[in-house]
Amino acid sequence: TLEHEYKVIQDLGKLFQVEDKADSIVTSIRKRLTDLQEQASREKDKPSVMIVQYMSNKLVNWGDDYLQADMVKKLGGRLLLHTKGYITEEEILKQKPDVIFLMVTEWDYDKKENLRSQLLHTPSLNSLPCIQKERVYILPLYEGQYSGVRTAEGLEHVAKGLYPDIR
């Protein structure tokens, strides 16, 4: 959760005797979250969301217990599935997400656009509005899970995916 990230940053600040810097980083992230939440609150539509990742060429759904899910929920998105596990294309079709965030790990950063394209061009998913409107957004693991000082960047990416006009 975001609270966990704040604690990690502050704990590291204590460990390295830079508590003021850590507090400043946490304050900055909290301020950015508040700003994004204020903008999101003015949006009429609260998009439904799935967070997925390719693992061994199969899709895995990320559940509630992860930072990126907390980001989605704190910004007004509606997470459709709440447990982590492999998911079929049929299950994605049933959920009809407005937005899909595609988690990409460090060993896949160089092919992130190919992975996004693979999802966008999966024939069985082409009836989904999020596929037709290309509302599939890459979320690097370093921004959406154990993000630490990059938490604000992760929040911004999630906010832009949920509400494209947000600043």
Feature-to-residue mapping (PLM):
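Structured C-terminal subdomain patch of bacterial secreted/periplasmic proteins
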Residues: 4, 14, 23, 104-167
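Second-shell loop/turn segments in exported
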Residues: 10-25, 56-61, 79, 141-148
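Basic- and aromatic-lined ligand-binding clefts that recognize polyanionic substrates
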Residues: 21-75
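Alpha-helical scaffolding within the catalytic cores
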Residues: 31, 86-91, 119-126
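Interaction modules related to DNA damage response and DNA replication/repair
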Residues: 73-90
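Proline-aspartate-enriched helix->loop->beta-strand connector
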Residues: 88-105
